[in-house]
From Swiss-Prot:
Keyword Ligase: no
GO biological process, one term: base-excision repair
EC top class named in words: hydrolase
Organism of provenance: Nocardia farcinica (strain IFM 10152)
One example GO MF annotation: DNA binding
PANTHER family in the record: DNA-3-METHYLADENINE GLYCOSYLASE
Keywords, ordered alphabetically: DNA damage, DNA repair, Hydrolase
Protein name: Putative 3-methyladenine DNA glycosylase
InterPro entries: Formyl_transferase-like_C_sf, MPG, MPG_sf
Domain of life (superkingdom): Bacteria
Length: 212
């Protein structure tokens, strides 16, 4: 394990997203290696304006943690039922976060199988943002967890940076604003990566870039 700190995430969201690939998120008995992520910026006043982001229209009670320091957990419900897990990025006061879209279970496999009984294969266990949150047992009460605090119930462990040649990038899934911005990053070698689905409200066609 490389010697790392939260300072490695005090960067723009796409750079942080690439840095998170290969990292491990631990919660209780379960650990998941990150293989697919999406970067999200902030409001129009910040350095990374992003109308597709929850913080795109400014600070609210819901997204407040996105405007805080890097390395904290931003959790929200999608469609009122799926717990989505994000890691905050960038300097304190500047909104940014990375959505954790998919991972490979590396510890606690039996626990996760119990949480995801409908998964057809182990590669499905933490594939997709909602399944990722379920696999780790993360709930709304975990909002704001400091992921680099050794005493925290949920912890993030960064691995050595991966070569750019191992990482693919392309448009984000299901967003209608800035639909072609290539801020989704994944490891093509992993069977746990989710399929790309373009929002029906997004204009035009998308381009997915291979590893480079």
């Amino acid at each position: 394990m490389a010697v790392v700190s939260v300072e490695e995430l005090v960067v723009d969201p796409p750079t942080a997203a690439r840095r998170l690939l290969g990292a491990t998120l631990r919660s209780g008995q379960v650990a998941v290696r990150l293989v697919e992520v999406e970067a999200y910026g902030g409001d129009a006043e910040g350095p990374w304006p992003d109308p597709a982001s929850h913080s795109g229209r400014g600070r609210t009670k819901r997204n407040a943690v996105m405007f805080g320091p890097a390395g904290y957990l931003y959790v929200y419900l999608s469609y009122g039922m799926h717990t989505c897990v994000n890691v905050t990025t960038g300097p304190d006061g500047t909104a940014g976060a990375v959505l954790l879209r998919a991972g490979e279970v590396v510890d606690g496999l039996d626990v996760v199988r119990g949480r995801r009984p409908t998964a057809r294969t182990d590669a499905d266990l933490a594939r997709g943002p909602g399944n990722f949150g379920t696999a780790l047992g993360i709930a709304l009460d975990d909002y704001g967890t400091a992921l680099f605090d050794p005493a925290a119930p949920i912890r993030l462990e960064l691995a050595d940076p991966l070569p750019a040649a191992l990482i693919a990038d392309g448009p984000r899934v299901g967003v209608s604003s800035e639909a072609d911005r290539p801020w989704r990053f994944w490891l093509p070698s992993s069977p746990a990566v989710s399929a790309y689905r373009r929002s029906p409200r997004a204009p035009g066609a998308a381009t997915v870039r291979a590893p480079r």
